[in-house]
Design a protein with these regions (language model features):
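Short beta->alpha connector loops at strand-helix junctions that form conserved
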Residues: 88, 93-95, 123, 145, ...
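Residue-level signal for inorganic ion chemistry
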Residues: 7, 30, 87, 119, ...
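Hydrophobic packing residues within well-ordered alpha-helices of enzyme cores
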Residues: 30, 102-105, 133, 154, ...
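ALDH superfamily catalytic-core signature
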Residues: 141, 149-187
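Conserved small-residue-rich beta-alpha loop and adjacent elements
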Residues: 43-115
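Generic hydrophobic/aromatic pocket-lining and core-packing "Φ" positions
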Residues: 80-81, 130, 151, 187
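A structured beta-alpha segment of the ubiquitous adenosine-cofactor-binding alpha/beta core
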Residues: 52-53, 120-143
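N-terminal Rossmann-like NAD(P)+-binding subdomain of aldehyde/semialdehyde dehydrogenases
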Residues: 1-51
């Protein structure tokens, strides 16, 4: 309830949307990745009777996560839960417009037993806090959701260190309208 209230106050969304869409999604995301954590296994492939090929999945290390403002709780969970399941620590920069929900999620994770220092929140503006995360040599991967412009900047800035980078950029919502479509009803 506190988390939904914080989200509504930060985003201006109705409490019902914060509760059902965002908080419901957060709960489902953490539940899913809690189960997934037990299924991250390496593989063994028999090449021939004298040769095996083994893979071992290991955490990537420290993940820098930069979040947008539009779905702050849900998108925070989409970054935090998989990183926890994979055994990674993280430095998270929430949007400067909606930092409180992410801070509250981190607090709840700590109360649930996640050790201190696993989830680290770095509030601030992107040009300062985000840039510090991207340029930090001890951060092994960057996960960013936001604009294409900033995504390009992150990709360039991280190329010197060859960090792994995941970008979710500038969502699109295309529509296909056929000749017989009533355009007025589509608007």
């Amino acid at each position: 309830e506190t988390l939904a209230k914080i989200n509504s106050e930060e985003t201006g969304k109705p409490i019902r949307e914060s509760s059902i869409v965002e908080l419901g999604g957060v709960i489902r995301t953490f539940d899913y990745y809690a189960g997934a954590a037990t299924k991250i296994l390496g593989n063994t492939q028999v090449i021939n009777e004298n040769l095996l090929s083994l893979t071992l999945k290991e955490p990537v290390g420290v993940v820098g996560q930069i979040l947008p403002w539009n779905f702050p709780l849900l998108l925070a969970s989409w970054k935090i839960a998989p990183a926890l399941a994979a055994g990674c620590t993280m430095v998270i920069k929430p949007s400067e417009l909606t930092p409180l929900g992410t801070l509250e999620i981190a607090k709840l994770c700590e109360e649930a037993g996640v050790p201190n220092g696993v989830i680290n929140i770095c509030p601030g503006v992107g040009e300062v806090a985000g840039a510090a995360i991207v340029q930090n040599p001890y951060i092994n991967k960057i996960s960013f959701t936001g604009s294409t412009k900033v995504g390009k900047q992150i990709l360039k800035a991280s190329s010197d260190t060859l960090k792994k980078v995941s970008l979710e950029l500038g969502g699109k919502a295309p529509n296909i309208l056929f000749e017989d479509c009533d355009i007025d009803s589509c608007l």
